Amino acid sequence: MKRLIRIYFLSCLGFLLFGCGISNYDRGQEFLAQEELKAAADYFTAATEENVGADEAHRELGITYYRGRFFPQAVTHLQIASDTLKDERTALYHGMALEQSRKYEQAIDAYEEFSALNDSPEIGYQIKARLAHLRNQHLIQSAKQAVQAEDQIDLTTIPEDKVAVYYFELLPGRDDLVPLQKAITALVISDLEKVRGISVVPRLQLQRMLDQMRLQQDTVFNQETKNRVGRLLGVANVCAGTIEGLADLDLRLGATVVNVKAGEIEAASVQQGVESDFFDLQKSMGFDILDALGVTPTEKQKRVLNRRATESLSALIAYGHGLAASDKSDFVTAEQYFKLSLKEDPTFQLALRELDYVRLLAEAQEQNLTQIEDLAMESAKARTARQQRLNRMNQALSRQFIPPTAADSPREGDINPPKSEIQVVVKN
């Protein structure tokens, strides 16, 4: 009889320790740590069907699929988890799974969520570089899709306030001004962005569209190309222009506005003067373009528009060289030119912004998602350990007698507890 009782007791104990003590989720974690992905997936799948902790099980199942390179399945489960879990682990793996699935726009959102949750400067910079890379990839992807669906474009759906600024055509005579083709475009975009009532396409979006169009050199600046670019970018108007070097270092800037829906072109501005007056010419041309677009800036906006991004033509030319190199993914050369631009004019914010951008893209070229994953997880572990230490210290430093509950009320013969608080000081 005693033997039967002992066997029964041991059986119950084993059931309690191994049957109830280790959950499907815990088993999945063990196998995931050992890279036994099939077994981990089975246990996490079972855990997702349980009432408690299903969202965490979906997260770990998504991570398991991610490590097995089953990215669509990883996205599915990490999306379910991200609906309720707002933690670094969920956001990071969700972003990486979306990136691997080439869902760049959604991946950007997930990485931004992770960045908001993470406070490590090192991993923060890595994610910032990743975001720069993904935004570029998203522009490329969107441009490809637009070209593929070109026949389905409905001009009636294009918003009237959307504008693109095309590259300026350099007329023969001054090859040294080639960098101004992109630099002037960037200046005009920067000015138009300051005016309410119009939405301006970023220069890089224009560039990525031109990359996908694969234009012949002799068609880059013709009228049909500008119309087509406008349709593909979904804009109502395309601003374009010319740069002409004249005798005695004179310059002539011309600007036109192409109405994409009507296919009509309107002369907007002609500005001519000596090279030293270039920035006055550029500003006057900008106001003429706004007038041709039917936009009247307020007095406050006029004051903002009259501020010059730079007054150094050499800085602007170096900046244009940098843009050309950056567009070809030659980030080393681009960085050199942007540094030169800033050497000529340390206050040139457009050059500083592009310098930061190419450095991020250069960093992204060297990145490995596995390294980012490891770095982020180490950062999370260090932060958790630090918080646990702080919690222990806080408990030790604030330890005191707690008033007794009803169940612990004094009984006859008990010694009354001290009325003063007892502080425990922990010394190193």
Residue ranges and their predicted role:
Residues 105, 109-164, 282-321, 347-416:
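Pro/Ala/Gly-rich low-complexity, hydrophilic intrinsically disordered segments
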Residues 91-92, 102, 110-112, 220-293:
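Amphipathic beta-strand/beta-sheet edge segments enriched in Tyr/Trp
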